[in-house]
Amino acid sequence: GQGRRKALRELASRLDGLYVPQFYQPGYDKKGRLKSFEPVEGLPQSVKRMSVPTGKAADRHTIVLTPNTEFGDKFLIEIGSGCSRGCRFCAAGFIYRPPRPWPEEIINSVIAGAGDIDKVGLVGVEIADAGAIERICKHLITHGKEVSFSSLRADCLTPELLATLKTAGLKTVTIAPDAGSERLRRVINKGLDEKTIVEATERLAQWDILNLKLYFMIGLPTEEREDVEAIVHLTKKIKHHILKICRDKRRMGTITLSVNCFVPKPWTPFQWVAMDDLESLQDKAKIIKNGLRHEGNVRTTFDVPKWAYVQALLARGDRRVGSFLEAALKTGSWKKAYKEVDLNPDFFVSRERDRDELFPWDFIGHGINKDYLWEEYQKALKAEKTIPCQVGICKRCGVC
């Protein structure tokens, strides 16, 4: 009723970070593109994105542990927010700027709160400070905990960190090359060359961490067949180098490829890009499957393109996408939902955006300059590098 509306209106006008959709009115042009997004009743044009202050970092951990869930037996601890690297596909790396590693003393106090839980997972977009990670791992070992990571940077595997990981009994490490070719890694601003990646996997094997998981994406902007084939070539090269070490140890681990379809995300330099079509993604997956079919000790897992399409629809659409959600719930099928709703989902998923197009997420105040994201997109098309964030020094993106 009117009482509830008035209360929401009052809260939205006073509290940063509060978005009430009914108080913002979208307008569309003849082509169906968003042309305006206006607040009503005097509310701010932009809704500020709230960030976690360092003092609240102690709250960034698993609160409820329940069985029969993905991490039901593992206590997850966030070790920082944001990332300095600037990978152009990564939403978390941009929307959580500036990068903020949590103080070690706070993380150690959270570890103490894990109680009798044996397994601890360290989570973060950027796990880069090898010295800090080494000390945190030693603290976990001292308290009798098993440790795992979301992934580790190939250029951060120091001998000291590797020795600590071995002591911790780690059997598997995940590294994310993300693209197979040097060129495409420059496009996405990954900042890792092939030599660094291969040498990192060799060092892991030398320290008896023999199981390796590699993250790759297909469908990245400017990707050609040669870039997809490079995933196969890089995997074979890594295996060849590891095999020489494993022969001396008389045991071989497993290399597992996790291959996901690239989905263009809001607030990244690739927010203007059209998603690759499903048939193309399926063909690229086949290239990798066939290329590694006869490689022993190499396993491949693939994202399902049709579900990546759903993810892109939800990520890139505006409030009209709610009609697809309702139809999918009613029919029990996304395929039926696409037919039932009088909108073409390709409009949101497969359409390249115009330079000055208004996006449904532009009203969120992340502090990032949209022109900066466009400049990064243009640098991507030229495969040009951007240096990592220099917090408090550089002013390039507008956040600091």
Name what the model sees in each region.
Residues 108-256:
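Conserved SAM/AdoMet-binding glycine-rich loop
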Residues 130-136, 162, 222-231, 266-277, ...:
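Short glycine/threonine-rich loop-to-helix capping motif typified by GTGT followed
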Residues 19, 57-59, 65-66, 75-82, ...:
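Structured core elements
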Residues 1-105, 324-330, 334-364, 368-379:
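Acidic, low-complexity intrinsically disordered segments
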Residues 363, 382-400:
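C-terminal amphipathic alpha-helical interaction region
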Residues 72-76, 88-97, 117-123, 180-187, ...:
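Glycine- and acidic
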Residues 1-38, 266-318, 325-333:
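Glycine-rich beta-alpha loop elements in corrinoid/cobalamin-binding modules
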Residues 10-22, 125-130, 152-157, 217-219, ...:
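A glycine-rich phosphate-binding loop feature that marks nucleotide/adenosyl-phosphate handling sites
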